[in-house]
């Protein structure tokens, strides 16, 4: 089955986890940014999972170097443009790029400049390629609560101009949603859609609380609902889409193999799952690679993929007009 030729949708892709290694090298040389190595083969080991990774926290260490080259307007615009260029080459028709603006203030940029630069890169790529993109703003759970309010408030002026949603990301502690009730209440009032990283690192109850306390419309990962019957039931009853990222889940040791990943069980039980990369560079993956692995190890069929694709259309935060265009591509999904 040629998954490369099929239309695709990406709902969970981190900008700072999806840079070209060549671009990291190029910017580092241009801006005099120190790197542990300027040899591409050696540098890959610092920004990608090559052999083994023991935890989510270890996985997150791979973002340190990419963020060093994402501190100017020019670089942010370029990196956003290149991401859309890369996924368009993989026949992705729509992508929701997510990033945390406060990771890019080291050289004095303000939040508005940071968001604007990324949006410019997205819009430039849209003009050249058959792809549409939107932006999800991330609030870092390892920063203080006032910083989350700052992102919500300052990012709100871009709602309707390319920004569609708010997210909570970084390491996952049990019962984190309770700390962010007021932040997400404000986000909802501002008009953001809401997707929350939860149930990625062993705590299924976080998914339950993300939905009940934070009004999450989608869940990033959510795989540990398998260990929390109440969360599983709520996700199924409310038809909450899960942004599943299989290779990333293997890298963070959520599961030992594709065969033991609960994705197919969720799909067969009617859970609204979507397939995503999480971080193309860190996990050395693409949507096509994800689908090929699921086909090889889990028996993913063309019929299954059509369900996944239409799930992603429905789950997306795209405009009604864009959703209609995306639905029309489903006719191309044939073996």
UniProtKB/Swiss-Prot annotation:
Keyword Zinc found: yes
Catalytic reaction(s) noted: adenosine + H2O + H(+) = inosine + NH4(+); 2'-deoxyadenosine + H2O + H(+) = 2'-deoxyinosine + NH4(+)
Cofactor: Zn(2+)
Keywords, in A-Z order: Hydrolase, Metal-binding, Nucleotide metabolism, Zinc
Molecular function per GO: 2'-deoxyadenosine deaminase activity; adenosine deaminase activity; zinc ion binding
SUPFAM superfamilies reported in the protein's UniProt record: Metallo-dependent hydrolases (SSF51556)
Active site: 200 (proton donor)
Cofactor note: Binds 1 zinc ion per subunit.
Pfam families in UniProt: A_deaminase (PF00962)
InterPro entries given in the database record: A_deaminase (IPR028893), A_deaminase_dom (IPR001365), Ado/ade_deaminase (IPR006330), Metal_Hydrolase (IPR032466)
GO cellular component: cytosol
Amino-acid positions noted as binding Zn(2+) in the UniProt annotation, renumbered to this chain: 12, 14, 197, 278
Top EC class for this record: hydrolase
Residue(s) at site: Important for catalytic activity: 221
Residue sites binding substrate per the record: 14, 16
Task performed by this protein: Catalyzes the hydrolytic deamination of adenosine and 2-deoxyadenosine.
Name recorded for this polypeptide: Adenosine deaminase
Species this chain originates from: Clostridium botulinum (strain Kyoto / Type A2)
């Amino acid at each position: 089955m040629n998954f490369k030729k099929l239309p695709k949708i990406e709902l969970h892709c981190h900008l700072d986890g999806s840079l070209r290694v060549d671009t990291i090298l190029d910017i580092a040389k241009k801006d005099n940014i120190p790197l542990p190595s300027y040899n591409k083969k050696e540098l890959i080991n610092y920004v990608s999972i090559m052999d083994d990774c023991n935890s989510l926290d270890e996985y997150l260490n791979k973002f340190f170097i990419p963020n060093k080259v994402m501190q100017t307007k020019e670089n942010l615009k370029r990196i956003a443009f290149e991401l859309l260029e890369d996924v368009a080459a993989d026949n992705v028709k729509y992508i929701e790029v997510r990033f945390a603006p406060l990771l890019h203030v080291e050289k004095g940029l303000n939040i508005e400049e940071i968001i604007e630069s990324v949006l410019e890169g997205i819009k430039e790529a849209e003009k050249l390629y058959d792809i549409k993109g939107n932006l999800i703003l991330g609030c870092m759970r390892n920063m203080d609560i006032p910083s989350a309010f700052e992102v919500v408030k300052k990012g709100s002026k871009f709602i309707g101009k390319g920004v569609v949603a708010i997210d909570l990301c970084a390491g996952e502690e049990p019962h984190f949603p309770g700390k962010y009730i007021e932040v997400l209440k404000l986000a909802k009032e501002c008009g953001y859609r809401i997707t929350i990283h939860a149930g990625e690192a062993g705590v299924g109850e976080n998914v339950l609380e993300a939905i009940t306390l934070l009004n999450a419309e989608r869940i990033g990962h959510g795989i540990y609902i398998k260990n929390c019957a109440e969360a599983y039931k709520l996700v199924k009853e409310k038809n909450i889409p899960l942004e599943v990222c299989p290779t990333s889940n293997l890298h963070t040791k959520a599961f030992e193999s594709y065969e033991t990943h609960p994705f197919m069980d969720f799909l067969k039980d009617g859970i609204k799952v979507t397939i995503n990369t999480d971080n193309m560079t860190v996990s050395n993956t693409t949507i096509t690679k994800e689908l090929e692995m699921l086909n090889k190890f889990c028996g993913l069929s063309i019929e299954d993929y059509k369900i996944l694709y239409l799930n992603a259309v429905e789950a997306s935060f795209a405009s009604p007009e864009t959703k209609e265009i995306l639905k029309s591509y489903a006719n191309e999904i044939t073996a």
